[in-house]
Amino acid sequence: MIVEAREIDEIGTEGIIKKIWERVGNNPAYLSVDIDVLDPAFAPATGTPETGGWSTRELRTIIRGLDGMKLLGMDLVEVATPYDTAAEHTTMAAADVIYEVLSVMVKTPLSK
């Protein structure tokens, strides 16, 4: 399933969370996050910057909305740290994403 950055304008973070849950349900899932879903203001160091992308807060909200989902694993792609700003915006955003996903993963065991 692919969620495009522009969908946030139409259905908001809650709509995106709902769309993901409807697709995944109670099944185990693997999450792949492309950092270029974030606007270059929040993550400029990527191979394909997406103007009009999400804020870091919006992405964190969506990930937190997956609380209870059985995530098997995740990857975070397109982080090009050599191109990051001195403030390391992309690196910090990437760390936030990983932290949020790991938080969801440790709270929801895959089996009981």
PLM region spans:
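Catalytic cores of soluble, metal-dependent hydrolases
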Residues: 3-112
